């Protein structure tokens, strides 16, 4: 019977603040190699939107094409909300043009459509069609592929009435970045195959779903952790060492008194400095500082929010420093 590989929310973004370019490129290339290896166990790969984080740069397009032109099984793609240009439209339209993707295994659906692989029938409901409330008609036995934000209590509300998806026996969704079943419905999010923002939990898993159909109605769903390098944020106390990780990209928040933080040099490993509340015992190290620098340190010490404007105003007094 049919085996389905499902991924979503790759968010290819090579020019991300505080993320080394070559490390990010290498991370995606490692992901591509693992996806190609998983293809050997599957009949079809569904990519449920948000391959890109935003309108891509040329190097990001080339990176995507290096993978997509290498896939060896039928691969179906729908755009997500990050690939939308205006209501109902997506820049993925450009990838449907002749010779944009030179691999006959790949099909991009920017409009509602259907396709079959073996005994599996798919109905595609891209993000732009959802925006226009153009739900495709239900065909018995179809698997729905779409990109819709579900509810994440208490702050994230659903953008669609999920009860309308209930006729489909299985819905493969993109948007939410963590792997889970949506409530008690037949809707499943594979989550992102790699973390797209800095995590504090190094053990959190990211990957893809594999569906193994035992007959035309029953299937087994398996989550596969791709174990890719992660973006990690750690918090340490001033004086602790910021250690470079050989696999993950780790940045550090450093806490301490204002005088302790003033002695910490800015490096690629430093995310930000967090000043502890000032106390009577804390003293500012004002050696080799001019008057403007002293004022800047003092304003930060007493936690003035708009210290830059205060310093700029002070400079207009033209005091000899």
Tell where the protein language model's regions lie, with residue ranges.
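Beta-strand-turn-beta hairpins that frame and shape the catalytic cleft
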Residues: 1-6, 114-124, 139-143, 184-187, ...
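N-terminal active-site segment of His-dependent metallophosphoesterases
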Residues: 1-63, 67, 135-141
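Active-site neighborhood of phospho(di)ester-bond hydrolases with catalytic His/Asp-centered motifs
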Residues: 6-8, 45-50, 75-86, 107-112, ...
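Metal-dependent catalytic neighborhoods of phosphoester/phosphodiester hydrolases
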Residues: 15-18, 49-67, 84-103, 156-161, ...
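Accessory, non-catalytic peripheral segments of nucleic-acid enzymes
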Residues: 44, 213-321
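Conserved catalytic scaffold of divalent metal-dependent phosphoesterases
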Residues: 83-164, 193
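Active-site regions of enzymes building and remodeling cell-envelope glycoconjugates
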Residues: 105-108, 119-122, 141-144, 158-159, ...
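Conserved beta-sheet core of the metallophosphoesterase superfamily
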Residues: 154-219
